[in-house]
């Protein structure tokens, strides 16, 4: 891990560069895969008498490079905040053991004998990521007394804002068109860039499905891994809290009101990526809407 930073004073720090190479990763290897594809249809029971025999290899490669701008105000005068923007790229030749992690990439390597064809964006790659975290203690009410002080003093607000671009996705289809003898998810042929301009993306056509074509039998598809970028997310979580002190500070209480996805922004789940499925390229669900919760904590 390499970090280069330049301090701008007591209130801010600007990191410049980060690099995190990792040359080990888990790859799912089907031991039933044929060494080469042959142009003949063979009954699977002949070449695969034992189904679902897999091996895990720690031979995968991953690498992360990013530039980060960070602005921080340390707590003073009741206010602190941390703001970061990261432009980064995470690459790998494996999505984790049989498509682990976010499950948006592929279920293991299409061809374990050609891992160069598996190199692409990692499952957790966010090209753009902007975050803000802040705490602000409201200044009013400190000079009040009695009931007015209990009601108006001691309030503070918290905010966490997160904007990030979408995760990569890998198109695939079920079935063994290549006749390679395994149940690993195959990829189709890619004939053009499936990613649409943002202004053309809709829930019924998030990416250009005509760019994906099922390949002819007895060969692997030409699509790379993680060639589609899913929908980005916007998260704004807010909270208000009030501290109470009773009986000469011996009994304290804190009231909290928390608003997750406070602006009720619709964050879409990834679209369908399975060729031949009616949901291909379509978004059919969304993440949680606004959630409000209240809490009371006592300390004595």
Q: Which ranges hold each PLM region?
A:
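Short, solvent-exposed micro-motifs at the edges of structured domains
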Residues: 1-300
């Amino acid at each position: 891990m390499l970090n280069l930073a330049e301090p701008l004073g007591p209130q801010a720090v600007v990191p410049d560069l980060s690099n995190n190479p990792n040359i080990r990763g888990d790859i799912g290897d089907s031991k039933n895969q044929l060494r080469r594809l042959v142009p003949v249809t063979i009954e699977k029971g002949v070449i695969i008498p034992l189904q679902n025999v897999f091996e895990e290899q720690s031979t995968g490669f991953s690498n992360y490079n990013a530039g980060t701008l960070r602005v921080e105000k340390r707590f003073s005068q009741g206010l602190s905040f941390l703001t970061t923007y990261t432009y980064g790229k995470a690459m790998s030749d494996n999505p984790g053991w049989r498509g682990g992690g976010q499950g948006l990439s592929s279920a293991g390597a299409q061809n374990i004998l050609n891992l160069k064809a598996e190199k692409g964006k990692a499952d957790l790659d966010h090209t753009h990521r902007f975050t803000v975290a802040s705490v602000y203690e409201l200044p009013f009410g400190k000079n009040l007394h009695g009931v007015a002080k209990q009601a108006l003093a001691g309030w503070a607000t918290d905010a966490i804002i997160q904007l990030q671009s979408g995760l990569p996705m890998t198109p695939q289809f079920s079935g063994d068109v290549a006749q390679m003898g395994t149940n690993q998810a195959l990829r189709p042929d890619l004939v053009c860039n499936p990613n649409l301009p943002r202004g053309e993306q809709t829930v019924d056509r998030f990416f250009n499905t005509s760019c994906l074509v099922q390949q002819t039998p007895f060969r692997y598809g030409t699509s790379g891994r993680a060639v589609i970028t899913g929908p980005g997310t916007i998260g704004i979580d807010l909270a208000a809290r009030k501290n109470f002190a009773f009986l000469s500070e011996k009994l304290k209480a804190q009231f909290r009101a928390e608003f997750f996805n406070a602006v009720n922004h619709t964050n879409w789940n990834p679209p369908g990526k399975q060729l031949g499925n009616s949901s291909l390229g379509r978004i059919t669900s969304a993440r949680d809407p606004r959630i409000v919760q209240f809490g009371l904590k006592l300390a004595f």
